[in-house]
Amino acid sequence: MMARGGEAMGERGKVRRMDNSSSESRDGSEGEESGIWRRGQDHFRHFSALLEEELKEETSIIQERWSSWSHHRLQASGLALLGLKGRMNGTLYGEDILVFEHPDRQHLGQHRFTHGDIVVISRSKPIGEKTVEGIVLERGPTRLRVVVGQRPKDLRKGTWRLDRGANRVAHDRMQEALEMFHSVEGDRGTILRDVLLGQVHDPEENASMRPKISGKFQRVERVHTELNPSQNAAMEAAMSRRLTIIQGPPGTGKTHTAVATLAQLAREGRGPILATAESNVAVDNLLEGLLNTGVRAVRIGRPVKVRETLRAATLDAQLEDHPKQDEIAIIRDETDEVHRALPKLKGREKGLAHRDIQRNKKEIRRLENEMIQSVLENAEVICSTNIGSGHRMLDGRRFPIVLMDEATQAVEPSSLIPISKGCRQLILVGDHKQLPPTVISRKAEQEGLGRSLFERLIEVGIQPKLLDVQYRMHPVLREFPSARFYDNRLNDGCTASQRPAPAGLLWPD
């Protein structure tokens, strides 16, 4: 469970000390003003309360739906599928794939289950009975394929119900990131804390300082003919500043610039680098671009949520092909033999057999951890969603450089997850004039959860590097957004003749 705002920060019975100091004392009221947080404690309490409010609202909506909506309304809204038969349909990197379909394999009808959604699997209702959570792998007209960590008992017996579920893991990881961000224990959090809270005299000057990252870097000539001048300027700033905001209006090549920056950082040996985004689609786009440029990139996250053509680059896929799998297979075979012999053993022999089983399990865990560390250490860039970067596999690993795409679509606590892994150089890519973060609770949104860290830092005074050439719109279509949102600074990278009207469409004179 997440700690409520104002309570002592703790995890599994441990209490962490929180740094309530600021680098500079200021007069005035406590709390946030114009993007500035005068005290870290206020920032922590504020966002802890908003996360709790958001979780409460999301849980309340789902519980209300499950307890009071009729089966007909749930199905008509596309939020539940009932009367489905289940069966096994293979595995995906060690997890079971289940197929759910009507007994006569008729069309499922209109529903809102899509790839990557969390589903709750139950017999008749998700309240009051044991449930299993899964993730949608694929949707078809007559069936859903769902990946589960543990399949339900008696899968082929009777029928099943599927409901759209809530993601508590995301809320828990955001709360933990808040605790890490404000912790003063060891090397937790980030050296950028003061500038991110706005507690420095001149935020822009502070952000422009060179990052303090130890290590030997190669000096590689930067020749980027594929970047236009504004993209190249943004990349150069990101390479030399401790905090850079890259603002990319529609069609200006945000992800293209992000990939070029990551590739240059990797070429100079500045890893390990953590590249994140709020959505799986955006992370996949970063990963694809990096792989195409020859960067050794590894994708963290369940393969079911990763684009099929990129799954070979996931950590799970690379672990499956790791040479140490042969050692693990031998140990598992030995363990299976001991299990088969157990019923015939008695007394001391049985005790020794149980000891051998436990010893083998411990050895398998050690080998699995070695495999994970070797794959991660070989990577130049590790790609993940913001939430995914809080996975236990990355516990204890520090990432001096963090690049975050889609930064304007992430609530601030989500952005803090990758940042709180020892970030010393931060690059935020996005556009606060486009989609804001998605927030369910109106109260939480109005009190600040709907504003991204990206936008707040601009309010503090950090100057964004604008990508000013767009390649998507007809020049006439560009005129309004350029004037309305970007101070007439947008230019065209395409001509009117390159954006003709669709054939057969009659335009009014």
Predicted regions and their residues:
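Pre-ATPase regulatory/linker segments immediately N-terminal to the P-loop/RecA-like helicase/translocase core
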Residues: 5, 10-24, 28-52, 105-233, ...
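Conserved P-loop NTPase motor core of helicases/translocases
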Residues: 11-16, 95-96, 194-200, 204-219, ...
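Short, structured beta-strand/loop micro-motifs enriched in basic residues and often containing a Trp
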Residues: 94-105
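Short hydrophobic/aromatic beta-strand immediately N-terminal to the Walker A/P-loop
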Residues: 244-245, 274
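Walker A (P-loop) phosphate-binding loop of P-loop NTPases
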Residues: 251
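Motif I (Walker A/P-loop) of helicase-class P-loop NTPases
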Residues: 255-263
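Conserved helicase motor core of SF1/SF2 NTP-dependent helicases
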Residues: 268-271, 279, 387-509
